[in-house]
Design a protein with these regions (language model features):
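Sec-dependent N-terminal signal peptides of Gram-positive bacterial secreted proteins and lipoproteins
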Residues: 16-17
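Bacterial N-terminal signal peptides that target proteins for export
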Residues: 1-13
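Short, surface-exposed linear motifs at loops/turns and structural transition points
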Residues: 28-127
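Histidine-/acidic-rich catalytic cores in large beta-rich domains
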Residues: 106-477
Length: 477
């Protein structure tokens, strides 16, 4: 029997199996027997590629759902979920569109016994028309997992999507507003920056961050505190529940000394660490720590509005301080997480390091800084100021004694993949690097090995849009 997406099928079943029947002689009282019943399946209004299986459990430690499609194109299982309540909803993610599935609940008891429910049917729906499509060419060993893409499409519905290694969309969450930064946070939730206004400040969208569970249900929102406008470039959730995010600050300044206007509106950034309540735990103000004279070519300083800092990435270092990528200064800085002092500057105006072994003598208009486990710094160098412009992923080893930044690794993309804006580089567990080329057209994301060979190459096959970043994750759950 087939059921359309969203229709609820009640499969009332109650199985009470004595533990001895599955555990080779283990005894068990009636009160300790494993049981399941009241099974139903329903569609997910946020995502037709998923289902929600409800089940009533007795004396169960874990529960999962095994699934297979008909015809046999797709089969798998959810993880084993810890049973915390007698009634559980189990998410089933990453299904194929327009497919009939057989779903089976599998429960494991506290004593190791196992019981399975009867198979139930579920029919997935059709993907929305505005979900982009992709193709992949794989030519080598890749890091297993899924790839997250924040798609900036400027359409009635703007999707954050996740694709598998073949390029098939396996998860999405649409939004009527433009989206950008899309990440899976350490607690397993997803966050996405959403434009929440029809207005813009200079070239920025005024945004908020939405936090979802893996079914795309909205859990909460995050915004800058203190009346400041929220920047859409990055949100990082910390293990203690705090959030790091960026905000905008405007200040009228006389820039005639550097070729600007006497009444320029200069746009800078704040970095805030917020408690879950929204209370500010830490705030850093670029105007208090950096000179406006450090603005980097090709930024135009002659207009009424001057996009001064354009911070676009945050990372927490191994010693608990903060890295901040400041695009319009072509600079990465390290900030003391207690005092706010700038501990060092890499690149740009008054850099504390000399570049060694880098024929481009540093990076230009970069995105996505990260500290690697070995202490090195990895970033996506957009290369707007290189001659000619060219993008790359680049890694530097920092020598704090001699103040040198030595090129440890780079991958210079073909000039056809030059990304004037956006982009990201992520070092993967297998040593490869995932590179998103931002505004390059058509959309491209590549996995490159340590030797500089492209082993996985994704490109869009539908329309003109941009991908702000890409992240490889191990699981949808």
């Amino acid at each position: 029997m087939r059921f359309s997406c969203g229709r609820v099928q009640h499969h009332f079943l109650f199985l009470l199996l004595c533990a001895t029947t599955l555990s080779c002689g283990r005894g068990g009282s009636a009160e300790s027997r494993l049981g399941l019943g009241g099974i139903d399946v329903r569609g997910n209004p946020n995502n037709v590629l998923s289902a929600i299986v409800g089940v009533q459990l007795t004396n169960a430690a874990t529960v999962r759902v095994e699934y297979s499609s008909d015809p046999a194109q797709d089969a798998g299982s959810t993880p084993d979920f810890e049973v915390k309540n007698s009634r559980m909803d189990v998410p089933v993610l990453g299904l194929m569109p327009e497919s009939n599935y057989s779903l089976q609940v599998v429960a494991t008891g506290t004593d190791g016994t196992v019981v399975k429910g009867d198979p139930i049917s579920f029919q997935t729906g059709s993907l929305p028309n505005d979900i982009p499509s992709f193709v992949v060419v794989q030519t080598g060993d890749v890091q297993p997992g899924y790839t997250m893409l924040g798609c900036i499409v400027f359409a009635p519905q703007n999707p954050a999507v996740i694709v598998d290694q073949t390029g098939r969309v396996v998860w999405y969450r649409e939004n009527p507003r433009t989206v950008s930064d899309f990440q899976k946070q350490p607690d397993g939730t997803y966050t996405v920056a959403v434009n929440n206004s029809d207005l813009a400040l200079y070239s920025y969208f005024l945004s908020q961050y939405q936090q979802y569970d893996n079914l795309g249900n909205l859990l909460r929102t995050w915004s800058a505190t203190g009346g400041w406008l929220t920047d859409d470039h990055e949100l990082r959730l910390l293990p203690n529940g705090d959030a790091l995010l960026l905000a905008f600050k405007q200040k009228m300044m006389d820039l005639t000394a550097i070729g600007g206007r006497p009444d320029a509106i200069v746009v800078g950034n704040l970095l805030q660490r917020l408690a879950p309540s929204g209370d500010v735990q830490f705030q850093w103000d670029a105007f208090d720590h950096l000179p406006v004279a450090g603005i980097s070519a090709p930024v135009d300083i002659r207009g009424a509005y001057v996009d001064w800092t354009h911070a676009n990435a945050i990372d927490v270092t191994s010693d608990g301080n903060y890295l901040l990528s400041i695009r319009d200064l072509s600079q990465v800085i390290k900030i003391d997480s207690t005092s706010g002092a700038v501990l060092w500057k890499l690149g740009g105006f008054n850099s504390d390091f000399e570049f060694i072994g880098d024929s481009w003598n540093g990076f230009s208009m970069q995105h996505g800084v990260r500290q690697l486990p070995n202490g090195n710094i990895l970033l996506f160098d957009n290369g707007d100021g290189h001659e000619p412009p060219q993008s790359r992923a680049v890694e530097y080893q920092l020598d704090f004694v001699n103040r040198r930044a030595t090129l440890a690794w780079e991958y210079r993309a073909p000039r056809s993949l030059y990304a004037a804006a956006m982009g990201f580089a992520q070092r993967l567990e297998n040593g490869n690097t995932l590179i998103a080329y931002g505004f390059a057209q058509p959309v491209r994301v590549q996995e490159v090995n340590a030797s500089g060979q492209v082993v996985w190459d994704l490109r869009s096959t539908s329309g003109t849009f941009a991908v702000y970043r890409a992240f490889r994750i191990a699981s949808l759950y």
